[in-house]
Amino acid sequence: ATYKVKLVTPDGPVEFDCPDDVYILDQAEEEGHELPYSCRAGSCSSCAGKVKAGTVDQSDGNFLDDDQMADGFVLTCVAYPQSDVTIETHKEEDLTG
């Protein structure tokens, strides 16, 4: 399946279609959108965002704890869309506080 992904970035919102077997970060780059990242392996917080609507599968990541994921935080480098989803990007500072 393919879902609509909306990213709310500091430069404004962007929308694109993302297959459910492609990481959101990878698809964003394919579409020409530059997002923050570092390890690309779900092991740091550089790419962190916050899910505002919809659901993702980020089971490949290991940096976020259950409470952080329950709060909506997502690592875009290891997140597959599970529905149409809206994510606020550039949330590393909110996460690490």
From Swiss-Prot:
Coiled coil: none annotated. The keyword Chloroplast applies. Residues 3-93 form the 2Fe-2S ferredoxin-type domain. Keywords: 2Fe-2S, Chloroplast, Electron transport, Iron, Iron-sulfur, Metal-binding, Plastid, Transport. Its cofactor is [2Fe-2S] cluster. CDD domains: fer2. [2Fe-2S] cluster binds at C39, C44, C47, C77. Ferredoxins are iron-sulfur proteins that transfer electrons in a wide variety of metabolic reactions. This is Ferredoxin-2.
